[in-house]
Amino acid sequence: MKTQTLVVLLTVAACQFCLSQTPAQQEVLQFERDACKAFLEADVAGLERVLTPDFTLTLSNGDVETRADEINELRSGKVHYDVFENYDMLARLYGNDTAVVLGKTRVKGTADGKPFDRIVQFTDTLIKRDGRWQLAAGHVSRIEK
């Protein structure tokens, strides 16, 4: 009985959180899910739409990758994702055209033929151009399992 009560309370809390999101925040979070899908499916055209031309991603080790780096890794098959999923996301909007999203990402796949399965904490900076969101910068820090 206690387990059922806990499940109900957690479900209600999760629903309240979802309902407390503004439509703009929901739009930003949907953008994040769509970006994950583009990486998962190695959708180069999709990535070209969602990443700004000057996009940068700072990795846990301090390396910085560009939009071209990300796209070339997927196009070449150097990196393949079986899982690419964001969760525990929180969107903050600053005006009508800037957003910062915090969350965690689980990625699983292969890089240079070697398997990986990791969780990272991320911070993404999004801008709205021509009526659509784009990812301008990201930073990830690996979380130990």
Predicted regions and their residues:
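Positively charged n-region of N-terminal signal peptides that target proteins for export
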Residues: M1-T5
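Bacterial N-terminal signal peptides
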Residues: V7-Q16
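A beta-strand edge to alpha-helix "cap/lid" segment located at domain peripheries
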Residues: Q21-K145
